[in-house]
Design a protein with these regions (language model features):
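Extreme N-terminal tail/first-helix region
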Residues: 1-21, 145-148
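A short mixed-secondary-structure module that forms the rim of ligand-binding clefts
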Residues: 39-73
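A short, Trp-centered hydrophobic/proline-enriched beta-strand micro-motif
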Residues: 13-28, 64-68
């Protein structure tokens, strides 16, 4: 397994679950950040949201976004991929319902035509696990691996 493949495996181990990130978008060169629940699948993060939300409106005018939490950071392109019941969303919908099961239907109304999914296709990122850091360029399928320990004291 090469370093890029190892990095992808680590990404899956870390984020193929309900994981909260701060999502940064921007409009008219003014940044906006909010926490969102995400799910990682196949070099993409998915977010369940609403088409009229500020984040979705900003993504539609500028697809460049960042995700960050606990020194994990990613840059990518975000797209509104439409309503959950669209045929092309069938596979990811079943995964999102499963991973977000405790709250998916309680907080979302699939009868609302404005419910949607945002897909974040990753350009680059930094993450770590078990003393190893990874700096990854997803477009070129290149990754660096190095010793890394999260030694920051978190303050609530």
């Amino acid at each position: 397994m090469n370093t890029f493949e190892k990095a992808l495996k680590t990404l899956e181990e870390l984020f193929s679950r309900d994981y909260q990130f701060a999502l940064a978008t921007s409009k008219d060169n003014i940044p906006s950040v909010r926490f969102v629940d995400t799910f990682y699948d196949d070099v993409r993060f998915y977010i369940v949201t609403y088409a009229k939300s500020q984040k979705t409106i900003e993504v539609e005018s500028n697809c460049n976004v960042s995700l960050c939490n606990k020194l994990y950071r990613f840059n990518g392109k975000a797209y509104n991929i439409g309503h959950p019941v669209k045929e092309e969303n069938k596979e990811i919908r079943s995964k999102l319902i499963k991973v977000f099961e405790p709250w998916y239907f309680e907080h979302n109304n699939e009868d609302d035509e404005n419910m949607c999914y945002i897909k974040v296709e990753l350009d680059n990122g930094f993450f770590y696990k078990d003393g190893t850091g990874y700096k990854v360029n997803f477009a070129s399928k290149k990754a660096e691996e190095f010793p890394f320990d999260f030694d920051i004291v978190m303050i609530e």
